[in-house]
């Protein structure tokens, strides 16, 4: 009986967690809403008339039931970024991958449970460029049975910061123009914090966000990069930040002056209000790792100490100088040093016996035109921009979603399962690449994984067009980042430096510009799962692929049946 006590204790904890779990019901109405920014009013696509959209707050073990009602003029789907959706790809959301989009006038109810996840995630549209304005935070708190954060200190308050991009025109028009011309899309006109550009933009200072703190208070900042196309540096004037979590996974705490987030990534930091009472800028601006045009403006909000009754001219002047304390736009060394400090809090169970050893080249490319420099060939030297993984530029299907076709056993005409595990040609990936390798093939290709297979992927950046930090997001999974380096990956020497003890767990990771990153995971979640660059111009150029994880043979190892209201194409 003594030997069974640990079992009964675990069983009691499990039952208690089920008793305390809640089901949260929400209605998301997708609609056009007048939004004024930068002196102009635009009819923006929003959820429930809010920009950014509603914040979802739940606990580990809770469930969400969200009915999306499309009253806008575009097809749409919603993705719950970072939620694993165990055996439930039908709730994942990327259009034409796990569902057909919700058409205007239609609706769909997303149902899913937070299973052993807690921290900061977010949700967003996963249809074309609609996530420019359709996004919000998804906060998962610890369960009531164990409600405290495993932080070195307990925060007094929490502040959620959604970093975004704003175009002074309809983002869908920006995308459509780029798709027509083959050129790069126009850059954004502003960055935003919780939808507001801040003091440094026209017609914006009155709406600059202010967050009150008391002297000595410890604040948990939940920072989310919801920008469409830009990695961002973020910092708070004169304040140190202690990183405690990333992508809803706890980390070993470490101190830094600045954090860097790629689109899709989240970082939780603790801030101690230990400076003289005043107003301090929170600021974010671009980290631009590519040889390409970018938005070089800076968004701000204000951290206001409660006992700073007013702002003197001198204090305001000092605050306006704060953005200069952010790193330079192309400071790859700072970005890499920040990412390198990420580690799990303790030893983790990393896959060691690899069943699938995959090598993916990721990068841009150019399609040659029969008649260069026409209206539809406005890319470099009369070409059209593209992007690929292993020389395959992904094409989204239209007549059915991949998951629906896979489940129905009707893949013909929708997708094939011949995605290459390695690039078709070996070359100097980060060197001077022959122009003959700049043009990929097009295809809707998936790669099959056996259930419970242990997977390693080397994501290798290339210098085709430009080297760049590509934030790669894997749907349906979290993975361990076991290694990273510059130049071409060398399996004979680089593998020995892998961190197999306490690597960080992420759902989105950047490939260093001109370098590589190694990730590992166990394929224990059956379904169709998209892997793609979270820079949206890149995914629509084709920087994506799909994993098809087969059903297992045991109990609860197969994909659930699709819901009755699943949209049809």
Swiss-Prot record:
GO cellular component terms, A-Z: apoplast; Casparian strip
Tissue expression pattern: Mostly expressed in roots. Also detected in leaves, stems and flowers but not in siliques.
Binding site for Cu cation 1: 79, 473
Keywords, comma-separated and alphabetical: Apoplast, Copper, Glycoprotein, Lignin degradation, Metal-binding, Oxidoreductase, Repeat, Secreted, Signal
Signal peptide boundaries: 1-21
InterPro entries (alphabetical): Cu-oxidase-like_N, Cu-oxidase_2nd, Cu-oxidase_C, Cu-oxidase_fam, Cu_oxidase_CS, Cu_oxidase_Cu_BS, Cupredoxin, CuRO_1_LCC
Residues binding Cu cation 3: 126, 475, 532
Cofactor: Cu cation
Protein residues bound to Cu cation 4: 470, 533, 538
Domain Plastocyanin-like: 29-145, 157-308, 418-553
EC number(s) reported in the record: 1.10.3.2
UniProt record, GO biological process: lignin catabolic process
Domain of life the protein comes from: Eukaryota
Reported function: Lignin degradation and detoxification of lignin-derived products.
Name of the protein in its database record: Laccase-13
Taxonomic source organism: Arabidopsis thaliana (Mouse-ear cress)
Highest classification ranks of the organism: Eukaryota, Viridiplantae, Streptophyta, Embryophyta, Tracheophyta
Gene name of this polypeptide: LAC13
């Amino acid at each position: 009986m003594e030997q069974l006590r640990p079992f009964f204790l675990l069983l009691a904890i499990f039952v208690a967690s089920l008793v305390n779990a809640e089901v949260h019901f929400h209605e998301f109405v997708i609609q056009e809403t007048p939004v004024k920014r930068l002196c102009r009013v635009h009819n923006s696509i929003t959820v429930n008339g809010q920009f950014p959209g509603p914040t979802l707050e739940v606990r580990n073990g809770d469930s969400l039931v969200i009915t999306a009602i499309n009253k806008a003029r575009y097809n749409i789907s919603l993705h719950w970024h970072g939620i694993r959706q165990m055996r439930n790809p039908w709730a994942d959301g990327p259009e034409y991958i796990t569902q057909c989009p919700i058409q205007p006038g239609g609706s769909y109810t997303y149902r899913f449970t937070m299973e052993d996840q807690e921290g900061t995630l977010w949700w967003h549209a996963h249809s074309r460029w609609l996530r420019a304005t359709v996004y919000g935070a998804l906060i998962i708190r610890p369960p009531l049975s164990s409600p405290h954060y495993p932080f070195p200190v307990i925060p007094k308050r929490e502040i959620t910061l959604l970093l975004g991009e704003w175009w002074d025109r309809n983002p869908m028009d920006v995308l459509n123009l780029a798709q027509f011309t083959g050129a790069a899309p126009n850059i954004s006109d502003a960055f935003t914090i919780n939808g507001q550009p801040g003091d440094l933009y026209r017609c914006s200072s009155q709406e600059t966000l202010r967050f009150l703190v008391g002297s000595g208070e410890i604040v948990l900042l939940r920072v989310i990069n919801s920008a469409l196309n830009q990695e961002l540096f973020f910092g708070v004037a004169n304040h140190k930040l202690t990183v405690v979590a990333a992508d809803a996974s706890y980390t070993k705490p470490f101190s830094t002056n600045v954090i860097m987030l790629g689109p899709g990534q989240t970082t939780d930091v603790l801030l101690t209000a230990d400076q003289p009472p005043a107003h301090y800028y929170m600021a974010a601006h671009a980290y631009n790792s590519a040889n390409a045009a970018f938005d070089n403006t800076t968004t701000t909000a204000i951290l206001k100490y409660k006992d700073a009754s007013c702002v003197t001219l001198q204090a305001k002047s000092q605050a306006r100088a704060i953005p200069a304390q952010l790193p330079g736009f192309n400071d790859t060394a700072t970005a890499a040093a920040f990412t390198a400090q990420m580690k799990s809090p303790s030893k983790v169970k990393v896959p060691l016996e690899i069943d699938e050893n995959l090598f993916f080249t990721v990068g841009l490319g150019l399609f040659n035109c029969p008649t260069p420099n026409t209206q539809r060939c406005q890319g470099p030297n009369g070409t059209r921009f593209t992007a690929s993984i292993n020389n395959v530029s992904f094409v989204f299907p239209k007549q059915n979603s991949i998951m629906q076709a896979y489940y129905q056993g009707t893949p013909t005409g929708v997708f094939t399962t011949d995605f290459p595990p390695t690039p078709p040609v070996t070359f100097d990936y980060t060197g001077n690449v022959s122009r003959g390798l700049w043009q990929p093939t097009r295809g809707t290709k998936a790669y099959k994984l056996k259930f419970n297979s242990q997977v390693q992927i080397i994501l290798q950046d290339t210098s085709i067009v430009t080297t760049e930090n590509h934030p790669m997001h894997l749907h349906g999974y979290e993975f361990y980042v076991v290694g990273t380096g510059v130049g071409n990956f060398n399996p004979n020497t680089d593998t020995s430096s892998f961190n197999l003890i306490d690597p960080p767990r992420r759902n989105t990771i950047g490939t260093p510009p001109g370098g590589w990153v190694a990730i590992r995971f166990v394929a224990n979640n059956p379904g169709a799962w998209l892997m793609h660059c979270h820079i949206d111009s890149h995914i629509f150029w084709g920087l994506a692929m799909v994993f098809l994880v087969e059903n297992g043979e045991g109990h609860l190892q197969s994909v659930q049946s699709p819901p009755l209201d699943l949209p049809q194409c």
